[in-house]
């Protein structure tokens, strides 16, 4: 994954790369945007995990609008928002965000899918890993994984 801010107009408001990666790792959710089967914009909130190196993983049901859209149009955008600070007296809002563009992959190996689910467990329920592993095994057949590169 490359850190690129060439298109940002307000350079004074950029997150540095370290904070952007921290936000990517720690944020509770993001909004995945894509083009649906009919060519219309479609955005949906998702849980995600960054693998720490090169990709983002997202889990979902093994069928539905999101997967149908990605099968037809694999280019996506993921927006993650961190801290938000309203400044009413200045008529503005300070917030931090990371916006990624990438290609979604939906036909992943069983091994990669299991790896992604374990990364998600470590992030989303670190205090219940053993129970989470049991849940992953029970629900593996009904869980799809999307990788964004």
What are these regions (language model features)?
Residues 51, 61, 81, 105-107, ...:
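Solvent-exposed residues in well-ordered beta-strands and their adjoining turns
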Residues 2-12, 85-149:
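Charged, gly/pro-rich active-site loop segments
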Residues 24, 69-70, 120, 148:
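A generic structural signal for nonpolar/aromatic side chains embedded in well-ordered alpha-helices
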Residues 3-31:
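Short, basic/aromatic recognition patches
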